[in-house]
């Protein structure tokens, strides 16, 4: 019996060291060397302070900022509560949420005739999307410009500068990073209140 336990124990120790220590450290080391920004979380800095990540959404509620997609990840894009809504397309609760969100967006942006993009009223699979569609960003441009007392064309220019095309030109859709736009707005057209919520 002991002759079977010894090889099993040695295998356990060997594979634990190999796959629990050596492999992760090797992959992390290679990633830090080849892709240092991405391996560190694609963090965005203002001076020496981290203000967010290009990969994780943040909640913005003030009128002078672009607003992200709705999130069901806790209160205010809580990464520890990341999950989808799990509501099917015919679920009455989803229909009610979408209807209420669309009405709120029309009021907030003072446009009762606005065509509301799907990403403006539906949560993503993770609930932490950092990006919105150019259509949703465009819908918010007038509100942001008015709140900052700046020309709408300047908001549209900042949105265009922060719009990424579809991957390889055909995979996915163009997208706008909300945090990048909001930081650019603060840099070019500062407001008198403390930055960021």
UniProtKB/Swiss-Prot annotation:
Localisation: Cell inner membrane
Domain of life: Bacteria
CC annotations in GO: plasma membrane
GO molecular function: ATP binding; P-type potassium transmembrane transporter activity
This protein's UniProt keywords: ATP-binding, Cell inner membrane, Cell membrane, Ion transport, Membrane, Nucleotide-binding, Potassium, Potassium transport, Transmembrane, Transmembrane helix, Transport
Cited InterPro entries: KdpC
One Pfam short name: KdpC
Recorded topology in the membrane: Single-pass membrane protein
TM stretches of this protein: 7-27
PANTHER family: POTASSIUM-TRANSPORTING ATPASE C CHAIN (PTHR30042), POTASSIUM-TRANSPORTING ATPASE KDPC SUBUNIT (PTHR30042:SF2)
Biological role stated in the UniProt entry: Part of the high-affinity ATP-driven potassium transport (or Kdp) system, which catalyzes the hydrolysis of ATP coupled with the electrogenic transport of potassium into the cytoplasm. This subunit acts as a catalytic chaperone that increases the ATP-binding affinity of the ATP-hydrolyzing subunit KdpB by the formation of a transient KdpB/KdpC/ATP ternary complex.
Family membership noted in the UniProt record: Belongs to the KdpC family.
Subunit (UniProt): The system is composed of three essential subunits: KdpA, KdpB and KdpC.
The protein, known as: Potassium-transporting ATPase KdpC subunit
Higher taxonomy: Bacteria, Pseudomonadati, Pseudomonadota, Alphaproteobacteria, Hyphomicrobiales
Name of the gene: kdpC
